[in-house]
A protein has these predicted regions:
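Residues that define the transmembrane beta-barrel architecture of outer-membrane proteins
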Residues: 29, 52-58, 108-114, 138-142, ...
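Transmembrane beta-strands of outer-membrane beta-barrel proteins
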Residues: 29-35, 58, 67-69, 86-90, ...
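Residues on the lipid-exposed face of transmembrane beta-strands in outer-membrane beta-barrel proteins
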Residues: 35-37, 58-64, 78, 116-120, ...
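Transmembrane beta-strands of outer-membrane beta-barrel pores
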Residues: 37-43, 64-66, 92-98, 132-138, ...
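Predominantly the C-terminal beta-signal and adjacent terminal strand-loop region
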Residues: 200-256, 379-431
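Outer-membrane beta-barrel translocator/channel fold
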Residues: 51, 99-105, 158-198, 225, ...
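Short glycine/proline- and aromatic-enriched beta-strand/turn motifs that initiate or cap beta-hairpins
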Residues: 23-68, 165-169, 233-295
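Short loop/turn motifs that connect adjacent beta-strands in outer-membrane beta-barrel proteins
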Residues: 22-29, 66-85, 125, 151-157, ...
């Protein structure tokens, strides 16, 4: 997972910055952000007869001519010509491992698979997709999918049917858990039937839902730990997307930006920090971050909010208690600008963060709480800036801002299996 996320997030930043900085105008982009709650049945025998497991799943959505982010999936287009029915992409996708939540942390959460996809569009509604995917141990599976998109007024529906081939190593790892049981099973083919739905409520607000059922192959079903042949899942939630009732703007008010910050770790939680009661890290661990802001839109529900997709690269400096590490972030950030009496702006970002080596501030907290730490965590950013040009009455500086931001990694209070089902994380006060 480490190398794939590293390459993917770094390439995302390069592609976005290259495209946007070359344009004199910034048109409104296809974007979205959502909060989903997933519940799935557990097909395995469990000690406490747990039949379902649930997780909170924040999602981002974005697409331009170079790449896309679609909820739990993202990719880079290798071939995508407007006059062709074919499309080829390098993709990554989160795959849920549905076991009781009490043991998900020991299993180190869900998995991110990487691979390639070829898509063929039969017409404006129906398409076929072929994928070859692998996990971080290069255990392979392939997907053969037929799917469609239909719109009926405020409703959008996406039915799909997928046949999945799993090699013996993949099947043994995720359906007989060979490392724990010693049981090896053969390759198999399972089938999944599902449907996604999106309903436009008003303006930028949408309701989201998804359900599917999977029929396990005979090799998986006859594993000594599998109890049920059929497994179901349901997603429900809401999100903010482009208002389908409005024509997209051809020239946005907000422009791309680059943000550089330096920060200091604190063992304090977010509540104490906002109360101005933060403790200093005794080892003075520090970080330096670089973020690029790609404009998505300049309003939400008719309010003047500047919305950005913001990939970032963070260097955590070595100290007496940690070696250096690199963090990769991708998030969606909203800014609200106001006058008091000079021009200020307040920002909030939500996204995900991957770090190649766990920092001291996170490792010590996880050790105290008895968790296995997770490299992949949820990301939050809160910032307040003052406009330098306004502050010094210099028109040439009106695009420059200076201020404070809180750099936060966490796992959503044990409610997210994809983040290792842990509670806690790290905070850095940055300027």
């Amino acid at each position: 997972m480490k190398h794939v996320l590293t390459v993917s997030l770094a390439c995302s930043g390069l592609l976005l910055s290259g495209a946007a900085l070359a344009e004199s105008k910034n048109a409104e982009q296809e974007w979205g952000i959502a909060a989903m709650y997933r519940t799935a049945s557990i097909p395995f025998y469990t000690a406490n007869d747990d039949s379902t497991v649930s997780t909170f799943v924040p999602m981002m959505f974005f697409e331009n001519e170079h790449l896309y982010i679609d909820g739990i999936e993202g990719g880079v287009f290798l071939y995508d010509e407007s006059d062709s029915d074919w499309r080829a992409s390098a993709i990554m996708r989160l795959r849920f491992v549905d076991i009781p939540k009490s043991i998900q942390n020991a299993f180190e959460g869900d998995r991110v698979d990487f691979g390639g996809q070829i898509r063929y569009n039969f017409d404006e509604n129906w398409r076929a997709e072929f994928e070859v995917m692998a996990d971080d141990e290069f255990q392979f599976h392939s997907n053969y999918r037929i799917a469609a998109n239909y719109e009926f007024g405020d409703w959008e529906l996406e039915p799909s049917f997928t046949i999945r081939y799993k090699d013996a190593d993949f099947n043994s790892s995720y359906y007989s858990f060979k490392d724990a049981t010693g049981e090896k099973i053969g390759a198999g083919i399972d089938a999944n039937l599902g449907i996604k739905a999106r309903y436009h409520v008003i303006s930028n607000l949408y309701l989201l839902g998804e359900t599917s059922v999977t029929r396990l192959d005979s090799e998986a079903y006859h594993s000594q730990i599998v109890e049920d042949r059929y497994q179901g899942e349901v997603f429900v939630g809401f999100g903010f997307f482009n208002d389908k009732g409005k024509e997209r703007k051809s020239d946005l008010r907000n422009r791309p930006y680059l943000r550089v910050a330096h920060g200091w770790a604190t063992p304090s939680n977010m509540g104490d920090i906002f109360k101005l009661n933060a403790e200093k890290d005794e080892y003075n661990n520090q970080m330096t971050s670089f973020f690029y802001g790609h404009p998505l839109t300049d309003e939400l529900f008719g309010l003047p909010l500047d919305i950005y997709l913001t990939p970032g690269l963070v260097h955590h400096w070595s100290s007496d208690v940690q070696s250096s590490s690199t963090e990769y972030v991708v998030a969606i950030k909203a800014y609200y600008t106001f006058n008091w009496p000079t021009k200020w702006r307040f920002g909030v970002a939500e996204g995900m963060s991957y770090i190649d080596n766990i920092t001291y501030i996170e490792a010590t907290e996880m050790e105290e709480k008895g968790y296995t730490p997770s490299n992949l965590l949820n990301y939050l950013d809160f910032s307040v800036d003052v406009n330098v040009g306004d502050l010094f009455n210099q028109k040439d500086w009106e695009n420059m801002w200076v201020g404070y931001s809180l750099h936060h990694r966490s796992a959503i209070f044990e409610n997210a299996s994809q983040f290792g089902r842990i509670k806690g994380g790290s905070n850095y006060n940055t300027i």
